[in-house]
Amino acid sequence: MKNFDSLYHELAERAEKRPEGSGTVAALNSSLHTLGKKVIEEAGEVWLAAEYQSDAELAEEISQLMYWAQVIMIKRGLTPEDIYKYL
């Protein structure tokens, strides 16, 4: 099972190795503006799932929000440690 750190390391490895056909690589090649819009979209889906959907659907939406937040972290050069100091 993945956690925040293991997901980050998986995504960072993809960013470094740039495997062909990777959705993460495609996302990293897009602008921060585009990635920011994706985070906003996913945050809205988390809210809607919290209001109207099952716990499983909510968990899935939260996982997608975490993914996109980490893509932005990697694009900007942040690590989990940079985030943890604010938790």
UniProtKB/Swiss-Prot annotation:
Enzyme Commission number(s) of this protein: 3.6.1.31
Keyword annotations: Amino-acid biosynthesis, ATP-binding, Cytoplasm, Histidine biosynthesis, Hydrolase, Nucleotide-binding
Main enzyme class: hydrolase
GO biological process, one term: L-histidine biosynthetic process
Subcellular location: Cytoplasm
GO annotation, cellular component aspect: cytoplasm
Main location: cytoplasm
Pathway: Amino-acid biosynthesis; L-histidine biosynthesis; L-histidine from 5-phospho-alpha-D-ribose 1-diphosphate: step 2/9
Chain segments annotated as coiled-coil in the UniProt record: none
Sample GO molecular function, one term: phosphoribosyl-ATP diphosphatase activity
Catalyzed reactions per annotation: 1-(5-phospho-beta-D-ribosyl)-ATP + H2O = 1-(5-phospho-beta-D-ribosyl)-5'-AMP + diphosphate + H(+)
Similarity-based family: Belongs to the PRA-PH family.
NCBIfam families: histidine_hisI, PRK00400.1-1
Protein name in UniProt: Phosphoribosyl-ATP pyrophosphatase
